[in-house]
Every structure is written in C-alpha cells, then in structure tokens.
C-alpha cells in the first residue's frame, strides 16, 4: 500500500513541469489566518488549505454554511433532520463532529456540546477557511480531520453603508436580512445586522406539529477600533433556533415517499450568545502580539440545560530574519453543561450532576526561510480534564438505576508538526507536511463507554502542489493517514452498543484535485477527491471504514452573460458507501447520487439585485445519512434512511448602498 501512496505522489509531482512557468496569480496571494493567526499567503503555507470567499458563496446560491462547503475537495457534509450539519474532513465517518474543530472568527465553538452551524447566516460570512489534515498544534484536541474557520464580515471603513434582502422559496420558506454600518471619527468602525428564516421544511411533521415552522433569528453587533499598526475588535451574536424534526424511514418508505414522517418526531430549541474579542498590535519590526478571547452560552429549552464556555489565547510572534519567525502561544478553555431538570433514580428524584471540561495548552511554532525553501516546525503540550457522569439502566425495565460521577485526566497530549515548502516559481509551490494529531473521548463518548479509555492518535503525511498557469489555478495533494485507538460507536452487537477504541489501526490513503479556469466571462471549476479507508488490524481487519464514500466530485460553471446578469450551475457526485455504523460491512454499499443546483441573478447599477434558483434540479432521491439496526426482533437487521431534501425553488431581491 505504501507503493500506491508513492505512485500517487509521483503523479502529483510529475505535473509540476506543466505548471513551472511564471503566470498571473489568481488566488495564491490570499492571506489566510487559520494556520497562522498573524496571517500568511496561501502559497507560503505548507498545508492543505482551501478558501471559500463571499463571492463564491453568493455565486453558487449557498443558503447555509453546509451549502457553502459542498463540493470542496475532501469535504463531506452530513446532516440528520433536527441536527447541526457535521463537516467530515477526509473520511472520519459518523464521528466527524468530534474530529473537526469549528472556529467562529478564530475562536473554538465546537467544544463541550458541539455548535449548530445553521445559526451562522451566509450573509454574515466574509470567507471560510478549511484546513485539512493539519491544525493540531494551534488547536489541539479534536483537530483529527482538520479545522473549519468561519470568518464573518468585519466593519468596513466607510462613512455609512447598508443593505436589505428578502427571499421566498419552497415549503413556505422565507429569509430576510438587513444590515447597517459606518464609522465614528477616523478610527471607530461599527456595524449591526439581523437575519431571519422560517420554513415548514421538506419532510412531513409529526401530526402534533402540523403547521408549525422552523425558525432561526440571528442578530450581530460588531465594533472595531483602529490603532497605529493594530486594532481592537469586539463581536456579539445572539441567535435563536427552533427546528422540528422527524426520524428515519424504512427502505420501502424511503422508496415510496421520502417526504413522509419517520419513526418519531420532536423539536430542538436553542438560544445562543457569543462574544468574541481580538487585539493585535505590531510593536516593532521584530515583535507582534495577538490576543483572542471568547465566551459561548447556549440554552437548550427543549432539553432544559445550559452550556457555557470561556476561551483565551495570547500569542507573541518574534521575527528573527526575513520571512522567518517563531510564535509562542497559550490557550485555556473552561466549559460546563448544567442540567436544570431532576432525574429519577429507582423512582427517587434527584439533581442531575453537571458536566465539566477544562483544557490548558502551550505551543511553539517556528518558520525558517532559506532562499526558496521554507521549513516549519510546531509542538503543543495539552492537558484536558473531564468531570461527567455515566448512567446505569436496569436491563429488564430500562429504568435509570444509578448515575456514576466520573472524571478523566489526559495530561500528556503532545501534538507536533513538520513541514517543508518549496517556492519553485513566482506562483507555484510544492509542500510536504507531517502532523501528529490527538483526540480524547468527549463527555458524550465517555458517558456510554466500553473497555479501557485511550487517546486517539493520527499520523498524517501529505504532499501537495499549488500553482497558477495562464488562466488556470490548480491545487492538488496526496495523503496517508494512520490512526491508532480510533474512537467510534459500535452497534454491531444488538445487545451492547457503546463508544470504544478500535482494537486495531485504521489507514486512509487518498488524493485531492481542484482546478479553476478563468475566461473573459466564464469560470469553470472541477474538484474531485478519492479516499480508501481501511481497517488494517484487530476485530475488523480488512474491512472498509463505515460511512465513507471513496469518490466525491463537483463540476461548476459561472457565466457573466451581460453586465450585471450572471448564471451559475453546480453538479455534485458522491459514490456508494457502507452505512455509518456498519463496521463489519454486514450490509451492501449504497446511496450514490448526482445532484444539480442552478441560479440566475441580475444586479442593477442602483444597488438592487434580483435572483432566482433551484436546488436539486432533477429532484434526485437520496439520503443525508444511512444507518443500520441489528435488532433481533422482526423485521430484523436492516439499513434505515434519513432523506435529503428534494427539489426546491427560490427567488429574492437585495438592495445595497
């Protein structure tokens, strides 16, 4: 298998000759902040990073963060009705939620109980940076697949500006947004915005919820004070999200009518408050400082619990030569989940214990430049503490018998990375990166755990290339990931379903390719990724890792028909996969699909824009998720389906000034 990896590497590197001449830089001078808080150009990053800008998000007609990320090489978006989308980077499968670190303006928000991506309206997004197979040194525990950084729009240095929008669509969907910004004096910038959403959704509701709409409301307030060689920024976001959901469908139900209600129904209702603060200052030519801090508060009205978390990260950058520097950083996170309802234990009501998580970490990163060669090294030491409880149920009555307080201390979580980047032309670079990434069991994992508890360790090797030749940009890489003690949920035994560590190793080998061609009025995009996830030892030795498609692809085109009139079309493909929990490959693969989205917009010179579009143009029937049940009761072991949305249409109007 190593020979196959080397062959893939030769294929990638062999393409260098075709892109080795100087050419206009189309995308490679973008500055990214996810791999380095102080910012660095994409081509000077020895890591696989993708940037989805506000322009691309708008052109493809994305309605959510999940829509914006669709089609990115190596990225699969998973979603069940009533749950936040899960961003799967490089084949994590069903545990993707805890193997990807989600940042909002550089602040981790996917900590104690996860974060609902639906609460961030796309109208608020400046860009999304996707860092794959890296980020463990800066972000630590959980950065197994990588990092997704959602960067919202900062206040603009204008006297006054604003806008509003209204959209209507299928299933009685309405979206609206309004924003206003300006500056006070020469240094203080402000903006405020509101986004709203209501919908009856694609699938039928439980009868007791007929006629009720999902809704999301989000308010943002931002301020920025300009300093000499720096700035201070403060962001506040308040959001409410109510989502009615329904459960899975059996195969016949799914085939007959995927819109019908499932085996159960209910709703989620969350209220979020997020405060982020940033201070950056260039002290002199040698020293830069960066301080970030945040507070996240979530109240679940349906489950009646409160989650809150504090975060702070100071960083200092010392420049010791041209394009050479060392960064020292420290971060601290303190989170808890408070349960407001009592629980019944053997018929007696008592207070449910709270969950707590703390982490402390220090890290150092160095970058040294020698001519066209750049070398990076990083090391992180992290300590994670958990306090939680496991629940014991009577095997006959399923009555809660006991709550056992537990704690866990992971004191020696060491992550490190090494990278080499060669700038072989004014636009092209080829890189190698090695990362050791770690993941400790989450509180959700530990509450239903079987066997010894071990830290998951991933060793990630990657070779990649980026360049721009004439009117084409290219980004490609091959990777090899070896996972030890991988954490997963095993339900192959119908009488004992638990979280546990794999008793063997999991290997993932893959390649990614992204191309964009820019003509006078036309832009063409092709993106494809391939991954082979195999269990290489232990109980499931030789089996394919569950819930991971080998192939994903996106082909798209944007055409500026005339001044102001733009058309866009995107096609998406995902190949067959085993059910998300079918680790013994008991069932056959399935659920491959091709979908097409299209939209059209016209922007007038007076600031008004009209647009319309259709998602899933050909009304393709497929599932967002496929799981299984190993029940010994009739109808026995089988796969079950969570349908994706069918065809939907929308139209809207925007005004900006």
Predicted regions, residues:
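N-terminal periplasmic "start-of-domain" segments of outer-membrane beta-barrel proteins
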Residues: 27-58, 85-86, 100
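Conserved C-terminal beta-signal and adjacent last beta-strands/turns
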Residues: 7-10, 19-20, 181-183, 193, ...
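Gram-negative outer-membrane beta-barrel transporters
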Residues: 369-375, 384, 473, 479-482, ...
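Extracytoplasmic beta-strand/coil segments of soluble accessory domains associated
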Residues: 66-107
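Membrane-embedded beta-barrel scaffold of Gram-negative outer-membrane proteins
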Residues: 286-301, 423, 429-437, 455-536, ...
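Periplasmic-side early beta-strands and strand-to-turn transitions of outer-membrane beta-barrels
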Residues: 137, 149, 158-159, 165-167, ...
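Face-selective signature of the C-terminal outer-membrane beta-barrel domain
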Residues: 226-240, 267-400, 405-406, 410-416, ...
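Short acidic/polar hinge/loop motifs at secondary-structure boundaries
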Residues: 107-133
